[in-house]
Amino acid sequence: MPGYERAEVSAELTVLPSERAEKPPQEQIEAAKTAASETGLAHEAGPETLVVAGGRREVIEAMMEVVEASLDAGASAVEIKVEAEGNTPRFEG
């Protein structure tokens, strides 16, 4: 069973590259994948989408790293979908 299926929280990030950026679209996406890989969390990557999974705080920090890397590389946006397992502690208000 992949690690992301057992994780407390998983986040799916879709990089929306910009054609007008200095770096080509593929480099914008690769920047996100590299950042995700460097987090050390369980991750899976597709053409423009990647999933990071782990503890809640770890995933939030990883999302920030991936978003920053994507935007720094010229991406126009990053869409994020976060899912928590049923027994995961919720954010306290």
PLM regions: where:
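Charge-rich, low-complexity N-terminal segments
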Residues: 1-93
